[in-house]
Amino acid sequence: YFGIMDKLSIKRMDEEVFDRIYYKDAIYDYAMGHERFMETLCHSFPHERENLKRYVAAIRSVGNLISTDHLKKGRLSQEGMNFFATSAAGMIASVTTNRDLQNVLAATSLLYGGIKNKSTFYEHAMINNSYLESAYRFTEGSMQVSLELIHIIRANGGTVLNRKEVTRILVKDETIQGVEVNHEEILESTYVISNLHPQLTLSLLDKNHSIKPAFVSRIKSLENSYGIFTLNLMMKKDCCPYQNHNIYLHGNEDVWYDKEMHKGNTPSCMISMQVPRGNSKFTEVVSILTPMYMDEVSKWTDTTPEHRGEAYRQFKEEKTEQILQLLRRFGFHWNHYIEKIHTTTPLSYRDYTGTIDGSAYGIVKNYQYPQILSLIHI
């Protein structure tokens, strides 16, 4: 962890329940640890023990592929690529025919931008196995990771530049020369590592013969994942009891988000609470996330933050009320706890992170086309 792990302020989530699923008038808990996870779900699905064993074994096998030794190689093993060519929903269905259990096992698909007819079992298993091994929350916000990384970079002779937008990646004789910053300053370098969306990275590159136009067109044509509508509730002091687990609410029988079917609606959401300060037992901030595609805010595509107009504000208020209605449906009557509300849409993600379409997870990883992953080196 670059020597920062012992400097981070984190809190271990409840081992008995780190994720709580509300589905079809019932509550299901994800417990930490592979055996505990299986035993906990067996209380709700007593006849599914053997199938749950098979499921746990499957996600564990993927988890073994993302060890440090594997990741240092820079590429997925052939076994890993096989899981990329396997449907998440299909794999779950092959493990159990119980529809309720299928949906409970897929209930946290928001964590990887899950799409029922596209998402890979690799994504599903990698995320779920990681949480089963250990689940934590930051107690002082995630910004501390950035600050500690900055300290490490500087301690090793590096420089971190703020307010510096890379506006061009310089190429000469098929070799990287450096980057242009803010359309004026040139920083020379032998290597450029970009964590931008591949489409953005390619748009910054000088013309060259190494990357073919057909490849660029292919990358531009790839579908991006949905974005996120985020509702941040600032709670009144000592009003909202802290819960040391995430909460997933699902109002439909099928927990997978569907672009066409759910457009304009809020069938599901994830709820996460900020760890209280000091010895308080009450949270001050509740964050609620629900999927949203850029299509829903496309009429404001050409606007900038704080200048989107009254119609945009009204749109966000209506979405907020949809979410609060979903919460009330499951017994979370928090309206009288709320002091202030802040919201973000895929437009916010686009403008502050530069990601295409305000996507939360970048290019969709489609199990039907695993070869695409080798092209973009994911």
Protein language model features and the residues they cover:
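Rossmann-like flavin
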Residues: 24-118
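A glycine-rich dinucleotide-binding beta-alpha-beta segment and adjacent secondary-structure elements
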Residues: 100-112, 332-376
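Helical element adjacent to the flavin cofactor pocket in flavoenzyme catalytic cores
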Residues: 126-176
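Active-site-adjacent "gating/activation" loops or surface patches in catalytic cores
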Residues: 104-136, 375
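N-terminal FAD cofactor-binding segment of flavoenzymes
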Residues: 1-15
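Beta-rich nucleic-acid/ligand-interaction surfaces
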Residues: 162-177, 181, 343-355
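C-terminal segments that line or cap access tunnels to active or ligand-binding sites in enzymes
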Residues: 236-347
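Mid-domain catalytic core of redox enzymes
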Residues: 137, 167-281
